[in-house]
Amino acid sequence: NTTIDQSQKNLLNLLNEVDFRVASGLQSYSSAICEVLDRYAENGMNVNYPTGSRRSLEAAVRCCIVTSMNQTAAQVTNKYIIEAGAEYVLVSAHMGARHDKNNPTGLQSHDWWQGKVYKIRGSDPDAPNLLEATGYDINPQTGEGHVVNPLGLHGYNCRHSHKPWDKSLSNPYVDANGNPKIDVHESQQLYDLQQQQRAM
């Protein structure tokens, strides 16, 4: 148990080191992931999470770096949102977004809340509250973003982004009738295939 604890501490130290280099532009995502994997691959390690889930080292490193960089980008976006005095944000949409068959309209089902306009404070009939819908909050005074629920927007391994939005613009993720342009069934099939591939 002590060796595992030390290995995980060593991994966290290395992740912090490469996170700094990637965030400062000194190293690319790809090279950071390769460096971490090269230094630990020979041990065949897995990372155990407090939730009970377990990931291969490659999956854990990728998740950590992608999550960290997306959260950093979100903080920069939030500054622009505050400078512009925007009340609304548009959340991006992509094929293969995470979904939960047991709770298809829940926070952890990213395909449910992606591609929609949200209000930062309060809500409108056509713009739900950002925090309530996605688990992500933006302080309207400071622009600081906070992942309230790590299963939602900018949480674990989330690839979605958000940007300031003017409701007079047309949402590029929906058709003229307001329906998502991404086929939900195809997107869920792609997600399931990606999960099967990661499990191999």
PLM regions: where:
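Domain-core detector
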Residues: 1-153, 165-200
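Catalytic core of tubulin tyrosine ligase-like
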Residues: 160
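Extracellular structured ligand-interaction cores
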Residues: 157
